[in-house]
Curated annotation (Swiss-Prot):
Highest taxon, organism lineage: Bacteria
Family: Belongs to the universal ribosomal protein uL24 family.
Alphabetical GO biological process terms: translation
Chain spans, region Disordered: 75-105
Entry keyword set: Ribonucleoprotein, Ribosomal protein, RNA-binding, rRNA-binding
Protein name, UniProt field: Large ribosomal subunit protein uL24
Function: One of two assembly initiator proteins, it binds directly to the 5'-end of the 23S rRNA, where it nucleates assembly of the 50S subunit.
Subunit structure as annotated in this protein's UniProt entry: Part of the 50S ribosomal subunit.
Residue ranges with Basic residues bias: 94-105
Gene Ontology molecular function, alphabetical: rRNA binding; structural constituent of ribosome
Keyword Lipid biosynthesis attached: no
Species in which this protein is naturally found: Rhodococcus jostii (strain RHA1)
Length: 105
């Protein structure tokens, strides 16, 4: 999967189209990512007693995972781009690059 934790992404499809956010967590097994402030859902939690005796419950708003095909990585210029790879000469490691401008991501 070419989108990693910490990347800034732009939502290109869905109800939050046009929103930018940072990837909180990536789920490679399901090809989904959790983006900060995007795809917010309301989750109903049951009332349960905490260790201090206070009860917690009600409606909680949180982010839900979004499919990786619905987001595009934002490059250093702030434009959405596809991700490519090149091999670094001195270290021999694979480095992610922007397909639009050729710079490292």
């Amino acid at each position: 999967m070419k989108v990693h934790k910490g990347d800034t992404v732009l939502v290109i499809a869905g109800k939050d189209k046009g929103a930018k956010g940072k990837v909180i967590q990536a789920y490679p097994a399901t090809n989904k990512v959790l983006v900060e402030g995007v795809n917010r859902i309301k989750k109903h939690t049951a009332v349960s007693a905490n260790e201090r005796g206070a009860s917690s419950g009600g409606i909680v708003t949180q982010e839900a995972p979004i499919h990786v095909s619905n987001v595009a990585v934002v490059d250093s210029d702030g434009n959405p781009t596809r991700v490519g790879y090149r091999t670094d000469e001195e270290s021999g490691k694979r480095v992610r690059i922007s397909r639009k401008n050729g710079k490292d991501i």
